[in-house]
Amino acid sequence: MKYMTTVAAVFLSLACATAPAHADASVKDGKVGLSVKGKGLSVKQAGGWMDGHGTGVRARLYTVHKGQRTDITRWKDATPVTAGTTQFSNVDWNLNGRSFRNGSWLCIEFNKADGTPCAKIHR
């Protein structure tokens, strides 16, 4: 039994050591959340959610690099989603592997909420 535990621990440490670096992140600020999928400085998909439903809920992505803000997308209508008793508004973008500068922040902004979560893009 002790041998199997040692072998399992060694295997787990080797598996974790060889895992590729990735740029996946999930961040929440108040009622707003941001999810980013990609690798390194390249982002494949980004999306966000806001707690609760509302009419006219829209969102957009922007970056901040060295204090300068740049809008990445235009305003996009969010889709209201109900899962059991949970209600939220969801929006997604396919960024097709768009590259960002190292150290920039990818952020989401909703027109009906105050939170603006950001994920740092880095190598």
Say what each PLM segment does.
Residues 49-51, 92-100:
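Short linear motifs in intrinsically disordered
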Residues 24-72:
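Short, surface-exposed binding/anchoring microloops in extracellular/periplasmic proteins
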Residues 17, 53-57, 102, 115:
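Short loop/turn segments at connectors of secondary-structure elements within structured domains
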Residues 12, 20-22, 56, 75, ...:
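Short, intrinsically disordered, low-complexity terminal segments
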Residues 70-86, 123:
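Solvent-exposed serine/threonine-rich low-complexity stretches and specific carbohydrate-binding patches
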Residues 41-44, 82-94:
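Aromatic sugar-binding surface patches on proteins
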Residues 1-23:
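Secretory targeting and sorting signals
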Residues 96-123:
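Short, exposed beta-strand-loop hairpins at the edges of beta-sheets
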